């Protein structure tokens, strides 16, 4: 019983050097070692910390760098989609262009070359019409299917097949070059202040032409229709054309100027056609003013004509009458006529409804002469001995153009003698020269 076991002996009486490594002394000298990697492969199970953790939303907001990269990729995607759509559209259009080119070549083959130019007289139905050419009679022809029927109207210019004369195209109506030349692009420099006297004439033309274009509501309030046109008549040089220039300067309306002799054309029908084109352009550019100078060239009294030229002039005048007072309202188009011989005009041209106001331009009186001399000598360097009252009070019949010619001639005489001032003697010589040429060149009693 007194003997212990071997294990007991070791624990109690063993030597110090016989201690095991797992003793208390080894725990103090041992360093920390990380735990070994888990041998389990798979997702780590998260520990639940109660119902609060299950209800909380996870924080999945991306960082700023990730957001910028996402926007960049979206923009690249948009560009790629645009490129894809563009390529697909080009692929679809390529056969269409080839087909259009093929159709165009077929149309050209059907039209033939060369093509004739004619005029459409009447449309019978959707596929047939009556046409005429400048050198032949009228024909009943067909209209090809590719011709735009909406643009076909009687009187328009068309393209016809060279052999069968069918309608194969339409010529777009453009402005006649002669009418485009008649349009005054730059306003004249003359104004109402440059006109000496003629206060009553200026007032009348303002009421008949200028005021209806600028304030048409005044005529509507009073219940009247403004005049369609006026005629200016009087002796040469009394200011008819000058007043028309002043009207063009004072208003912003389109101004078309034509001389009566320009309406007389060589070929049959060209004169009336030019009149129609003139008023058509004026209607398109309205508000506008049509000024026809020397209207007596085409507006003379009608009589039995024996030549083709005289009959053509009468046709031109009839077309002018139709344009002045036809079924179509002129609207904002005003007409100004000017002539030296109103007694030779046809009464139908001067009746109310066509020309509602007739404005007479008499020779200037003493007050008007003085004003005209002041206007034309305002920029001249005059000597001290010049007395314009002598020329103002003279009994000779001066027109405004004569007074201007006297002032111009006096300045030329001063330049001839190397002088920069115009003397009284220069005016006297200029007056004698101008009046002598006037009496010599005009037959007696022409403008009585």
Curated annotation (Swiss-Prot):
Residues 17-33, 93-111 have a biased composition (Basic and acidic residues). Residues 1-56, 93-112 are annotated as: Disordered. GO terms for biological process: proteasome-mediated ubiquitin-dependent protein catabolic process. It holds the Pfam family AAA. It comes from the Eukaryota. Keywords: ATP-binding, Cytoplasm, Nucleotide-binding, Nucleus, Proteasome. One of its GO terms (cellular component) is nucleus. Its main location: cytoplasm. InterPro entries: 26S_Proteasome_ATPase, AAA+_ATPase, AAA_lid_3, ATPase_AAA_core, ATPase_AAA_CS, NA-bd_OB-fold, P-loop_NTPase, Prot_ATP_ID_OB_2nd. The keyword Metal-binding does not apply. Residues 1-16 have a biased composition (Gly residues). GO terms for molecular function: ATP binding; ATP hydrolysis activity; proteasome-activating activity. It is found in: Cytoplasm; Nucleus. Gene3D superfamilies: 1.10.8.60, Nucleic acid-binding proteins, P-loop containing nucleotide triphosphate hydrolases. ATP binds at residues 234-241. The 26S proteasome is involved in the ATP-dependent degradation of ubiquitinated proteins. The regulatory (or ATPase) complex confers ATP dependency and substrate specificity to the 26S complex. Belongs to the AAA ATPase family. This is 26S proteasome regulatory subunit 4 homolog. It comes from Oryza sativa subsp. japonica. The gene is TBP2.
